[in-house]
């Protein structure tokens, strides 16, 4: 029986794109910071002149799938990370945005064969979002780890 797993040792050569929503940027900027910190500590060049990582900003989480699709189709990236924060309000808008963003991102990943990490916080309150973006822990770090693992796993199976 073969066991195939992603590793973190062989991930320093990965090419990564991060697609990040501007809406709720108090949260998404913190997620980006955690994400870049993790990638850097695992050997990815995150400097301004890096050819290993690109960051694309979109207006909100609803727009994450379309830009993820275009970036994945370029063939330049081995893994994408989407970052967003959707906080429940008094209208059904939350449900629509979360549903379409998650379905769209999953569809793009399946159709292109490029792993896309779903780093969209979906919380009931701003406090919950802040806790997940740095007050208690920074899930941006976790999303980057998932990207490293999936990027190396895809190399192992292809």
Curated annotation (Swiss-Prot):
(2S)-2-hydroxy-3-oxobutyl phosphate binds at residues 90-91, 132. It catalyses: (2S)-2-hydroxy-3-oxobutyl phosphate + 5-amino-6-(D-ribitylamino)uracil = 6,7-dimethyl-8-(1-D-ribityl)lumazine + phosphate + 2 H2O + H(+). GO terms for molecular function: 6,7-dimethyl-8-ribityllumazine synthase activity. Gene3D superfamilies: Lumazine/riboflavin synthase. InterPro entries: LS (IPR034964), LS/RS (IPR002180), LS/RS_sf (IPR036467). GO terms for cellular component: cytosol; riboflavin synthase complex. It is an enzyme of class 2 (transferase). Its EC number is 2.5.1.78. The keyword Transmembrane does not apply. Signal peptide: none annotated. The active site is at residue 93. Pathway: Cofactor biosynthesis; riboflavin biosynthesis; riboflavin from 2-hydroxy-3-oxobutyl phosphate and 5-amino-6-(D-ribitylamino)uracil: step 1/2. Keywords: Riboflavin biosynthesis, Transferase. Pfam families: DMRL_synthase. The keyword Ribosomal protein does not apply. 5-amino-6-(D-ribitylamino)uracil binds at residues 23, 61-63, 85-87, 118. One of its GO terms (biological process) is riboflavin biosynthetic process. Transmembrane segments: none annotated. Catalyzes the formation of 6,7-dimethyl-8-ribityllumazine by condensation of 5-amino-6-(D-ribitylamino)uracil with 3,4-dihydroxy-2-butanone 4-phosphate. This is the penultimate step in the biosynthesis of riboflavin. Belongs to the DMRL synthase family. This is 6,7-dimethyl-8-ribityllumazine synthase. It comes from Prochlorococcus marinus (strain NATL1A). The lineage of its organism: Bacteria, Bacillati, Cyanobacteriota, Cyanophyceae, Synechococcales.
